[in-house]
């Protein structure tokens, strides 16, 4: 009896202590929320749980891509400011990245400023571009710099997450998606029955190679962060990472189907791949034309892969008036939830255009569908 009383007393003390901490934290926040410097420090030190909406390639700073490109003898196309693989042929519009990064004479520094701006969203508003245009234009420019650097990228984002007191990252990544698309180009027919539209054995082999790619990038991350040291390595080692298989929605229907099939196979085969997402501009003509078809791809494959976790997170409703004709507004979120069975919606800014907005929101609440606002 005395032991039980002591346990109750301890638990009560912990509850009172936690309640006191919560009140003190709330009071501190209220006192500094109009003071940007103190507020930033308060929020940076606050534990934040997980970041559920993060594109691995989009989370890397331009300067990191340039450093790797310089080390790997990559080039910059001076007309398009696109990073390319070497060699940099003399007399062409290709310049070795190592000649201007990390900097030097004034003319070199001027080029560096232009390149960093082109590879990021820095100062985009000064160039007469929308953030939307600039953001989506950067991926093709820095793509070549990411080749062979996936582990370095993983180390960078986990180190940064640790500094921000984020303990979990769910990274959108596309292992094997290009290979699946090439396989669909080689042989596919969406009019055939399930199992015959693309080669399932070929896609399964791609999935196994994709798993090996994840193994390699995680091994490289661990090495860079010295995570195997007895006394612990970099703080980024403590950040748990899982992946969303990232399907590129702007390609031909057969290719998107093959990618979606690959995503479900990865979810089935590898516990590190906890779901899928569709990426690339939702306002792209192909994305708009095939949107309903894509949702039905997910629906069908969810039913066929009942043993997998089937966690669907979708960019949906990332649209606004002026970006697309009004006929494309107000139904993408609804279809993502009702047809594809999405458990999370990315952005979802066009919800107010849905004529059935309250019914859609009610269904999302009932199904506990989260909205990723970032």
Residue ranges and their predicted role:
Residues 7-14:
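Bacterial N-terminal signal peptides
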Residues 1-6:
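Bacterial N-terminal signal peptides that target proteins for export
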Residues 19-373:
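Metal-cofactor-binding active-site regions of metalloenzymes
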């Amino acid at each position: 009896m005395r032991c039980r009383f002591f346990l109750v007393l301890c638990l009560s003390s912990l509850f009172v202590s936690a309640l006191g901490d919560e009140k003190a934290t709330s009071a501190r926040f209220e006192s500094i929320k109009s003071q940007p410097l103190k507020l930033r420090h308060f929020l940076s030190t606050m534990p934040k749980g997980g970041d559920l909406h993060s594109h691995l390639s989009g989370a890397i700073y331009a300067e990191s891509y340039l450093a790797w490109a310089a080390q790997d003898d990559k080039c910059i196309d001076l007309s398009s400011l696109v990073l390319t693989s070497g060699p940099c042929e003399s007399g062409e519009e290709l310049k070795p990245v190592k000649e201007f990064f990390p900097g030097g004479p004034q003319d070199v520094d001027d080029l560096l400023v232009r390149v960093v701006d082109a590879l990021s969203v820095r100062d985009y508003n000064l160039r007469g571009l929308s953030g939307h245009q600039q953001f989506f234009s950067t991926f093709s420019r820095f793509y070549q710099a990411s080749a062979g650097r996936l582990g370095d990228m993983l180390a960078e984002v986990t180190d940064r997450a640790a500094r921000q007191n984020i303990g979990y990252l769910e990274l959108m990544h596309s292992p094997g998606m290009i290979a699946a698309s090439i396989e669909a180009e080689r042989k596919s027919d969406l009019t055939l029955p399930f199992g015959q539209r693309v080669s399932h054995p070929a896609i399964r082999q791609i999935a196994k190679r994709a798993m090996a790619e994840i193994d390699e990038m995680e091994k490289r991350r661990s090495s860079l962060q010295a995570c195997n040291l007895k006394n612990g390595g970099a703080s980024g080692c403590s950040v748990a990472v899982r992946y969303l298989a990232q399907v590129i929605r702007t390609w031909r229907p057969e290719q998107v189907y093959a990618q979606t099939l690959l995503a479900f196979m990865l979810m089935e085969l590898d516990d590190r791949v906890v779901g899928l997402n569709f990426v690339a501009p939702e306002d792209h003509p192909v994305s708009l034309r095939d949107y309903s078809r894509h949702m039905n791809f997910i629906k069908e494959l969810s039913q066929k892969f009942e043993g997998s976790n089937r966690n669907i997170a979708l960019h949906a409703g990332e649209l606004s008036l002026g970006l697309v004709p009004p006929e494309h507004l107000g139904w993408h979120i609804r279809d993502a939830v009702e047809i594809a069975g999405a458990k999370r919606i990315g952005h979802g800014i066009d919800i107010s255009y849905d004529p059935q907005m309250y019914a859609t929101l009610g269904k999302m609440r009932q199904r506990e569908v989260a909205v990723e606002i970032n």
